[in-house]
């Protein structure tokens, strides 16, 4: 059965979804809109294996992809179901619960955080309430797991806190699962 949607029912591309730098993680809740076909509009949860099911498309591999990439995958999957152009598909991250990191050590509020956007080491420190009085900002580090391996990434937060622009630009981005340690 082929569906037809008039061109007037197609929505313009969302600048927000196309320009988003957020990559999908397991546990994220996505809002998927198929303009002009309300039956296909829904929220989906990305499963622990990094996939979700979508009507007429089947299983979609989402982990590590940008929302704009998922828009293209779903559009391609819907193509055989329509006569004429496929309605505009928009994917947005409704609840980014898959991007979490921890901050431990001498900070105001140590814990695990889900900021809803990517942050660098200095922003992660701010989210955790900033350093306490005796924090050693020159010895901060990120503990990062990649498969079975563990990496330690040194972070020079001391210079960044003093306003050194070159240091601010070089701060590493916190990845999902990272632990920022402030000794």
Model regions and ranges:
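Bacterial N-terminal signal peptides
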Residues: 1-4
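Ser/Thr/Pro/Gly-biased, low-complexity, turn-/loop-rich segments
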Residues: 7-183
